[in-house]
From Swiss-Prot:
Name of the protein described by the UniProt record: UPF0173 metal-dependent hydrolase MTH_1902
Family annotation (NCBIfam families): PRK00685.1
HAMAP family (UniProt xref): UPF0173
Residue ranges that the Swiss-Prot or TrEMBL entry lists as coiled coil: none
Similarity annotation: Belongs to the UPF0173 family.
Gene3D superfamilies hit by this protein: Ribonuclease Z/Hydroxyacylglutathione hydrolase-like
Gene Ontology MF terms in the entry: hydrolase activity
Keyword Hydrolase annotated: yes
Entry-linked PANTHER family: UPF0173 METAL-DEPENDENT HYDROLASE MJ1163, UPF0173 METAL-DEPENDENT HYDROLASE MJ1163-RELATED
A Pfam family hit: Lactamase_B_3
Amino acid sequence: MRIQWFGHSAFEITSSDTRILLDPFISNNPVCSTAVEEFEPDVICVTHGHADHLGDAMEIAERTGALLIANHELSVFFSRQGLESTGMNIGGKISIDGIGIRMVDAKHSSDIDFTEEVTSGGSACGFIIETREGKVYHAGDTGLFADMRDVIGEIYRPDIALLPIGDRYTMGPEDAAVAAGWIKPEKVLPMHYNTFPVIEQNPEIFAELVERTSPGTEVVILDVGGFYEY
């Protein structure tokens, strides 16, 4: 399994021949140099409706025919734009090409904020991608919440966690380190930081905190465009 980071919360997970793109904020992402036209995903998962997460999802889906996966409200919005989409809700799971995609809770807002009028984008979420190589938890935008320990950590037990550390709009390094301690993944990759001045963070500080909260977890810090093989 290959996990590639494109800055902010944009990742592509490749397992066998299936490519899953998550929160593809690409063309307006100031730290990403990859062109939108380079993406050829099979599936696009969107955690919520904010423009820095929905990003280029609709453009990529229209060009490639990729299936959009999101909460019910966003899925209806996508379908009304003529795009192939399937809706889910918290706790649900679907399977595509032998890969499980489970929607889990996140503590954040989700209005669609790039149209002329702000409209409801349903509830923000995270995803657990279950491949034959392992499980990856993409937290989306979220604050710290107890189900990270009681549900995500205790029941779903992801091998890899992708956690926001930018603060202000999500967890900061301290709370993200607590989350890592609750979830206890084998690996944790920080995300949603250093895209804009208001979320500037030093990921090495996060790594130092995780050494204390979850000594068995390795922190993997990727450069933008870099990837990790698991």
